[in-house]
Amino acid sequence: MVKVLGLVAILLIVLAGNVLSYDRQGTRKNLVIHPTNEDDPTFPDQVHISLVGPDKMRISWITQSSISPSVVYGTVSGKYEGSANGTSSSYHYLLIYRSGQINDVVIGPLKPNTVYYYKCGGPSSTQEFSFRTPPSKFPIKFAVSGDLGTSEWSKSTLEHVSKWDYDVFILPGDLSYANMYQPLWDTFGRLVQPLASQRPWMVTHGNHELEKIPILHSNPFTAYNKRWRMPFEESGSSSNLYYSFNVYGVHIIMLGSYTDFEPGSEQYQWLENNLKKIDRKTTPWVVAVVHAPWYNSNEAHQGEKESVEMKESMETLLYKARVDLVFAGHVHAYERFSRVYQDKFDKCGPVYINIGDGGNLEGLATKYRDPNPEISLFREASFGHGQLVVENATHARWEWHRNDDDVSVEKDSVWLTSLLADSSCKI
């Protein structure tokens, strides 16, 4: 049956026009990860957590049979003074796949910088997990990596990230690379569970989450929206495809490259209102995240609508709001730009960083444009991850760590000053 599903998926990819037009190198094989306990259909599988408002956490997991979605939690292992109930759902994809029961439970209020122990499904569950909430003071530490996938390189990246004591993981789109072959979503959930069950993972979608097939499956983002529910309602958004959240001192805006972004569209109006509501006294740093990069000197993905037209539509909004950083994925390489606005250096513009280098099966985008544009300060086609440490209201440090023969090597680093600290860039 698995072979049949694989052949169907390959055929559908071709029919959908999802054929790459440039060479990829440095691939490693994809992983297949089975459930930890296949004998127990109620055993929690693919556990991950995400932030919900200032003091709550969403616990998400999958079971193979129907259960009452509930979570018990507490600050001492084995002692659970808190409990909460949630919702469950599932989905079909074509006629050949049905997901397990996807459970979502929001717990809280929670204390900052505190370890909580929890069980999915109630106190009788045999598996205990734990997570730590983000702190309520600086420094704040973000791990960043996009285009992750389920390859051996993906596993290597996650192993490097796990050795760093970060607070929140940010993924700028292209999660599982299921490409319509739904069992890869399950493998992805199991691959990231050791990290995603311990720290909040905040994600946005990419082109590989679309999974739309004319006539056969007309509803895009089915798996993504069901499996990775983000706090969109809490930020006034009407769609799981774009939202915002706060971690102490930092406002983060997760934008949708593959949904409406034209002036006057719902996302545009939401972004406009969201930016107006930012209190720079309490959140002096503002970070935006997209999938398709607005600046890119790699040969890959040049001239795509989602990059060019979204930039034309929204760049000025971010510039006028003095957004400090913009992360993107899509291009399977690393690149850091200077502060930019309208294709030129501008000290009041955001720093743009492309980090679609998580390790997916497609490999690396190794061809760069020559000569190197002046605004591109560092570029390298290697897998890896980034570390953003917001030290205080005015300064942050960015590091990019390359996966080098399975050893994490720091290759690029820079100190950043908040635009709020520059008197000439005052809003």
Curated annotation (Swiss-Prot):
Main location: secreted
Stored InterPro entries: Calcineurin-like_PHP_ApaH, Metallo-depent_PP-like, MPP_PAP, PPA-like, Purple_acid_Pase-like_N, Purple_acid_Pase_N, Purple_acid_PPase_C_dom
Subcellular localization: Secreted
Keywords from the named record: Glycoprotein, Hydrolase, Iron, Metal-binding, Secreted, Signal, Zinc
Family to which the UniProt record says this protein belongs: Belongs to the metallophosphoesterase superfamily. Purple acid phosphatase family.
Protein name: Probable purple acid phosphatase 20
Statement: the UniProt record of this protein carries the keyword Amino-acid biosynthesis: no
Residues reported in the UniProt entry to bind substrate: 207, 330-332
CC cofactor note: Binds 1 Fe cation per subunit.
Gene3D superfamilies: 3.60.21.10, Purple acid phosphatase-like, N-terminal (2.60.40.380)
Subunit structure: Homodimer.
